[in-house]
């Protein structure tokens, strides 16, 4: 499955849905199997900042959340990730099994696990201020522009009839409203708790078309009032 034996694991340090002990276990076992493993605190942040190492990350095996979310993340930077495993919903034995690696029966005494866990625990926890922004699944997006019309924070723009996430840092933390409005369910917030908004394929959250239309009309009224009042909701303004 993976040729260069390079692995990137996202610990999602500021959120609780990725089990940190599971991250340490998998990282330790892979290192003991001579994989070059890097554990990062927040893949979302690295993509948002277009970090210099993101190209190398994309070429590695990425162990993070839903594959659809990760692919859409990297597409924003014109990168393609070929190998992605879901640590958010898969157990450590399942992930190791996909790499043809035998799990360890004594999970508490895996060589190197304790030091990796300390490394993870030292990552900064940015509750309420961690990277939170939408990514677009271009396989689903119809470029209708509803998200751009709906958003009050200037996150989206349209260039050559293509919707883009232009100002991810402007997004309001923990607000997935635009994703709920998307008729094709193309907008993903990887850190949201329910599918399909978080990139999952299940329908854990559903809104009827009439509810979506009502929310859309109400938001357009708010945008109009905002413009008339000359009020900006953008951060740092």
Model-derived regions: residue spans:
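Iron-sulfur-associated redox domains of electron-transfer enzymes in respiratory
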Residues: 1-131
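Flanking helices and flexible, charged tails adjoining ferredoxin-like Fe-S electron-transfer domains
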Residues: 1-5, 168-237
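Local cysteine-cluster metal-coordination motifs and their immediate loop/turn environment
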Residues: 12-16, 46-47, 60, 65-69, ...
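Alpha-helix boundary/interfacial micro-motifs
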Residues: 30, 51, 75, 80-81, ...
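Helix N-cap / beta->alpha transition motif
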Residues: 39-41, 137, 211
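Short alpha-helical interface patches
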Residues: 92-95, 144, 217
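Ferredoxin-like iron-sulfur electron-transfer modules
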Residues: 122-143, 154-180, 189-198
């Amino acid at each position: 499955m993976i040729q260069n034996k390079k692995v990137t694991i996202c610990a999602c340090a500021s959120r609780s849905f990725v089990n940190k002990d599971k991250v340490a276990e998998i990282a330790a076992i892979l290192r003991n199997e001579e994989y070059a493993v890097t554990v990062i605190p927040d893949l979302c942040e690295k993509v948002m900042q277009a970090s210099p190492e993101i190209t190398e990350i994309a070429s590695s095996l990425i162990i993070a959340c839903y594959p659809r979310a990760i692919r859409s993340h990297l597409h924003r930077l014109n990168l393609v990730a070929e190998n992605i495993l879901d640590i958010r919903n898969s157990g450590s034995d399942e992930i190791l099994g996909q790499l043809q690696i035998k799990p360890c029966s004594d999970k508490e005494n895996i060589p190197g696990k304790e030091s990796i866990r300390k490394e993870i625990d030292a990552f900064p926890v940015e509750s309420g201020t961690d990277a939170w922004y939408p990514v677009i699944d271009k396989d689903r997006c119809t470029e209708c522009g509803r998200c751009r019309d709906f958003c009050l924070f200037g996150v989206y723009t349209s260039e050559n009839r293509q919707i883009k996430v232009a100002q991810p840092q402007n997004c309001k933390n923990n607000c997935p409203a635009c994703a709920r409005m998307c008729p094709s369910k193309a907008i993903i917030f990887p850190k949201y708790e329910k599918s399909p908004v978080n990139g999952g394929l299940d329908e854990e959250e559903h809104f009827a078309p009439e509810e979506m239309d009502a929310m859309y009309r109400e938001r357009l009224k708010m945008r109009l009032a905002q413009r008339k009042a000359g009020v900006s909701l953008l951060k740092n303004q």
